[in-house]
């Protein structure tokens, strides 16, 4: 992994950040207990302190992801309360502000519903990682047994090289190594298949969640277009608000767009830089085929002129003469080549 894009190094600013510099960090970040609460820190440290040695790191990751789910659930609940409060606040304002804030509250409430759905799908990713952890935990005993037998053999060879137990332990070591090989192969296969399945769950859910939120944001901006923000002078009256039907239709369209969205209709597609290199490599095979076709066409043209078939027949005859005559082949070959 390139260091510029590694977790161990800070990233270069993006084009969006260069165009619009990001705001300063929020004042509420880590205000009381740093980056996580006391319960979060305890769960994280406890997950890596117990269980088989092989599965401790993944156990810690699974526990951290559980904390992520709890944080997202808290965010969804808070967003739902914020949507309700926005609608309550707008109720006491003018007709246009009241209607727009009510509809915006509906959209923000829908975002919280999408957060709940995302949590359910994200949990499938965590459970799949958890299955890898369980497999790692089952492989650890076979490793420990093999290491224990190896240590016993080394101890006996040092203390009593003639001990009859050494041969018995060596046979047990062969069986333990065979069992360990089978377990390691299963772990290798399951790790790869489960890892792909887990992150497919996560990335598919991220794509769906982000694109649906982008849809909601687009319809929210359409609602804002109905709000007249032109300044008025003191004593001037604003025109009567007539956007009730339009705002209602925007909500209906948003609901329809969310219901009809599928993963196949995702708008954002990745652009891979190495794909072009692969495409550049492909025509080389086509060029070889074209060269072969060109040679075939050239041979056909030559055969029409009678310039290829006769020398081949003469060469075959020369080979036969070489097998039969031997010494006369040296005389016949120059004649055939000149012919």
Curated annotation (Swiss-Prot):
Pfam families: Pil1. Phosphorylated by PKH1 and PKH2. Phosphorylation is inhibited by sphingolipid long chain bases (LCBs). Its main location: other. Keywords: Isopeptide bond, Lipid droplet, Phosphoprotein, Ubl conjugation. Residues 1-31, 273-339 are annotated as: Disordered. It comes from the Eukaryota. The modification Phosphoserine is found at residues 16, 45, 98, 163, 230, 299. One of its GO terms (biological process) is endocytosis. The modification Phosphothreonine is found at residues 14, 233. Residues 279-293, 301-318 have a biased composition (Acidic residues). Residues 1-19, 326-339 have a biased composition (Polar residues). There is a cross-link at residue 29 (Glycyl lysine isopeptide (Lys-Gly) (interchain with G-Cter in ubiquitin)). Present with 2157 molecules/cell in log phase SD medium. This is Sphingolipid long chain base-responsive protein PIL1. It comes from Saccharomyces cerevisiae (strain ATCC 204508 / S288c). The lineage of its organism: Eukaryota, Fungi, Dikarya, Ascomycota, Saccharomycotina.
């Amino acid at each position: 992994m390139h260091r510029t894009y590694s977790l161990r190094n800070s990233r270069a600013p993006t084009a969006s950040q260069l165009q619009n510099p990001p705001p300063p960090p929020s004042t509420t970040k880590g205000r009381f207990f740093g980056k996580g609460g006391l319960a979060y820190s305890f769960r994280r440290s406890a997950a890596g302190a117990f269980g088989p040695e092989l599965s401790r790191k993944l156990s810690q990751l699974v526990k951290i992801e559980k904390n992520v789910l709890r944080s997202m659930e808290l965010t969804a609940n808070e967003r739902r309360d914020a949507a309700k409060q926005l609608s309550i606040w707008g109720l006491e304002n003018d007709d246009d502000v009241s209607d727009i804030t009510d509809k915006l509250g509906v959209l923000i409430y829908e975002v919280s519903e999408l957060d709940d759905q995302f949590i359910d799908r994200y949990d499938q990713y965590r459970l799949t990682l958890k299955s890898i952890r369980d497999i790692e935990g089952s492989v650890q005993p076979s490793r420990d047994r093999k290491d224990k037998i190896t240590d016993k053999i080394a101890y006996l060879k040092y203390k009593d090289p003639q001990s009859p137990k050494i041969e018995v332990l060596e046979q047990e070591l062969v069986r333990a190594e065979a069992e360990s090989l089978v377990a390691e192969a299963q772990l290798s296969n399951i790790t790869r298949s489960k890892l792909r399945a887990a992150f497919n769950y996560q990335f598919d859910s991220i794509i769906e969640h982000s694109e649906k939120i982008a849809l909601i944001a687009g319809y929210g901006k359409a609602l804002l277009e109905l709000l007249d923000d032109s300044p008025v002078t003191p004593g001037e009256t604003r025109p009567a608000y007539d956007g009730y039907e339009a705002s209602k239709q925007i909500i209906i369209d948003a609901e329809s767009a969310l219901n009809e969205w599928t993963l196949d209709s995702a708008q954002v597609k990745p652009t891979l830089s190495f794909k072009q290199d692969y495409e550049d490599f492909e025509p080389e095979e086509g060029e070889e085929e074209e060269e072969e076709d060109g040679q075939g066409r050239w041979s056909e043209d030559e055969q029409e002129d009678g310039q290829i078939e006769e020398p081949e027949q003469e060469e075959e005859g020369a080979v036969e003469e070489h097998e039969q005559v031997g010494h006369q082949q040296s005389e016949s070959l120059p004649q055939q080549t000149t012919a």
